[in-house]
Design a protein with these regions (language model features):
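Preferential activation on post-signal-peptide N-terminal prodomains/segments
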Residues: 1-149, 165-167
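Residue-level detector of short, conserved catalytic/binding motifs and their immediate flanks
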Residues: 13, 177, 251
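Hydrophobic transmembrane signal anchors and adjacent membrane-proximal interface regions, especially
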Residues: 71, 90-92, 100, 156-161, ...
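Short glycine-rich, low-complexity/disordered patches
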Residues: 92-95, 146-162, 224-238
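Amphipathic N-proximal alpha-helical interface segments
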Residues: 99-123, 163-200, 254-259
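Glycine- and small hydrophobic-enriched segments that form the cores of compact globular domains
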Residues: 133-181, 187
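Extracytoplasmic/luminal low-complexity segments enriched in Pro/Gly and acidic/polar residues
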Residues: 184-259
Length: 259
């Protein structure tokens, strides 16, 4: 009997502790929700004061620290891609500014030091006849040319397919390739791309991407009447003064008029 009483007391204590913890958790969740709701209302008022609005579906993302990353240019990968597109008999020309141009009887491919690429080559397998076939053909081309990206996504408009792919699990807002299938049996490639694995420098530089600050700064530069739909933290690929490719932390903010 004595043990039964002790057991009941212990169970009661455990229930009381659990109820306390549950109540404390609920209170904190309510506090966080109230704080987020208050911040959302304040931001909407401030953006409205700038002459713009936030879409009803807009949600402010969390602040994040992103390290500055570097990329080594791979001339070997550039040449391999060009050789598949143009054939083994292509000629290679390199200019002083780092531009490398490949040319054959089938077309041309030009890579620039900042990661930009453009070219024209024959369409493998013939011209697709609808958007579904265009996506399928583009994915096949990117894969065969060594230009497929891990976690890539695709958008199609007519016979133009755009591939985007993240780096280090973060979007790179200007890293994309567009492949357009032409009626004459050729394909036109354009965009900005990178190969290899990014890495940090010894200094480990980076940026605190503060969403509210970036949003208000952006809103102050908008034309009156624009609606902000979303914002995403990520990178922008660019070349530094030493001609090294870098991934610079930045926000992409989408409105109803521009990206």
């Amino acid at each position: 009997m004595q043990w039964d009483k002790v057991k009941n007391v212990l169970i009661g204590i455990l229930l009381a502790v659990n109820l306390f913890l549950l109540g404390n958790l609920g209170f904190r969740l309510w506090q966080n929700y109230s704080r987020a709701s208050g911040l959302d209302a304040d931001l909407r008022a401030l953006v409205s004061g700038c002459g713009s609005t936030l879409a009803d579906s807009f949600r402010l993302p969390e602040d994040v620290f992103l390290p500055e990353l570097n990329l080594d240019r791979s001339r070997a990968d550039e040449e391999n891609a060009a050789s598949v597109m143009l054939g083994a008999d292509m000629e290679r020309t390199e200019l002083e500014d780092g531009t490398v141009r490949f040319q054959s009887g089938d077309g041309t491919v030009t890579w620039y030091a900042d990661g930009r690429v453009n070219g024209v080559c024959p369409i493998p397998g013939g011209t697709p006849d609808d958007e579904t076939a265009a996506i399928r053909a583009a994915r096949k081309c990117f894969s065969e040319w060594g230009l497929a990206g891990d976690g890539a996504s695709y958008q199609v408009s007519g016979f133009s397919v755009t591939q985007t792919a993240p780096v280090a699990n973060r979007p790179v807002h200007n890293r994309e390739l567009t492949l357009t299938f032409n009626a004459d049996g050729t394909a036109t490639l354009s965009g900005t791309w990178s190969f290899g694995t990014p890495y940090t420098t010894v200094t480990g530089r980076g940026a605190d991407c503060r969403a509210a600050d970036a949003l208000l700064q952006f809103a102050s530069s908008l034309e009156a009447g624009e609606t902000i739909r979303s914002m995403t933290a990520g990178y922008r690929m660019q070349m530094d003064s030493s001609r090294r490719l870098q991934l610079i932390p930045t926000w992409k903010i989408v409105t109803d008029r521009t990206d």
